[in-house]
Amino acid sequence: GLLSNYEHIPLNHPLSVTVPGAVAGWRELSNKFGNIPIEDILDIGINLCHEGFKISKELFNSLNNHSEELSGQSSGYSFYRDNQPYSIDTLIRRPQLGKTLELLKEHGLEYFYNGEIAKEISNSVNGLLTKDDLSSYKAIWREPLHQKIYGYDGWTSPPSTQGYLTLSTLKGFEIINNKDDYLHTLIESYRIFASDRDNITYDYQGNDQK
C-alpha cells in the first residue's frame, strides 16, 4: 500500500488529509441553534471574499512563519508574491473562495460533499479521498471536556482534537508556588501532556487507551 513507503504519514502530502468537516459543522450549528438563514450568513463571507480585507499584524506574522508550507499552495497567490507575504494593511481578495461559498448558497451545504466541489477535493488529493468518503461524512456532536481551573470552568473540544492539552497545561499551573519556576513548569507541563498525543489522539475512536 501507499503507507508502506513511509515510516510516518508525511505532513505535507495527500496522505495526511482528512475529510474537511467545517461545512458539515456549519450545517449542524445552523440547524440546531441558528435563527438566521444560512444563505444570509454565507453572504457575509461572499462579500468579504470579493470586497477584500486588510492583512492584520497577526495574519502577517502567521503567513510569514508558515510561508514555506503555504506559498506554494494553489490558494497561496492571494497572500504571497515571490514567496513573500503581502505587507500589513494590504487589501486581500479571495475570489475562488467566494465562488465556492456562492455555490454552497445556491445548491445547499451538502453540495460541498456531493457536488462538483467534492470532485475537486478528491482530485486535489489524487483520489485518496473518495466520493464515498466525502458523501458519507457527518458531523458528530460530542460532550466537551471540562476541568476546574483556579475555581473557573474550563471547556474545550475532546479528542481527536488537541484541546485536552490546553486544559491539562492550565491545570498544571495550580501547583506553581515559585514565580521563578513559572516558565519551566509551563514548558514541562505541556511536554508531559503532549507526549501521548501521537499515540492516542490521532485515532481516538479506534484506540482503547482513553
For the regions a protein language model found, what residue spans apply to each?
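M16/insulysin-pitrilysin zinc metalloprotease superfamily fold
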Residues: 163-177
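Internal maturation/activation junctions in enzymes
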Residues: 177-210
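Noncatalytic scaffold domains of N-terminal-nucleophile
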Residues: 1-161
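Short helix-capping/linker segments at secondary-structure and domain boundaries
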Residues: 31-36, 106-109, 173-179, 198-201
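Generic recognition of well-ordered alpha-helical segments
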Residues: 25, 100, 168, 172, ...
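Generic recognition of short, well-ordered alpha-helical interface segments
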Residues: 21-24, 164, 184, 188
